[in-house]
Amino acid sequence: MNEIVALMIICPLMVMVGLGMGFALLWLQQQA
């Protein structure tokens, strides 16, 4: 049960980090 809860918490965090990095790269490219 703990593994399921961990996945439910970690997966959204990984998605948020991925989106954040993607937007950051796009922003840096536009600023350059």
From Swiss-Prot:
- Provide the topology term for how it sits in the membrane: Single-pass membrane protein
Q: Where in the cell is it found?
A: Plastid, Chloroplast thylakoid membrane
Which spans are transmembrane here? Answer: 4-24
Does this UniProt record's set of keywords contain rRNA-binding?
no
Kindly state a single biological-process term from the GO annotations of this entry.
Answer: photosynthesis
Chief location of this protein? plastid
Entry keywords, A to Z: Chloroplast, Electron transport, Membrane, Photosynthesis, Plastid, Thylakoid, Transmembrane, Transmembrane helix, Transport
Q: Name one GO cellular component term.
A: chloroplast thylakoid membrane
Q: What does this protein do?
A: Component of the cytochrome b6-f complex, which mediates electron transfer between photosystem II (PSII) and photosystem I (PSI), cyclic electron flow around PSI, and state transitions.
**To which protein family does this belong?**
Belongs to the PetM family.
Q: How does it assemble?
A: The 4 large subunits of the cytochrome b6-f complex are cytochrome b6, subunit IV (17 kDa polypeptide, PetD), cytochrome f and the Rieske protein, while the 4 small subunits are PetG, PetL, PetM and PetN. The complex functions as a dimer.
Which named protein is this?
Answer: Cytochrome b6-f complex subunit 7
This chain's source organism reads Cyanidioschyzon merolae (strain NIES-3377 / 10D) (Unicellular red alga)
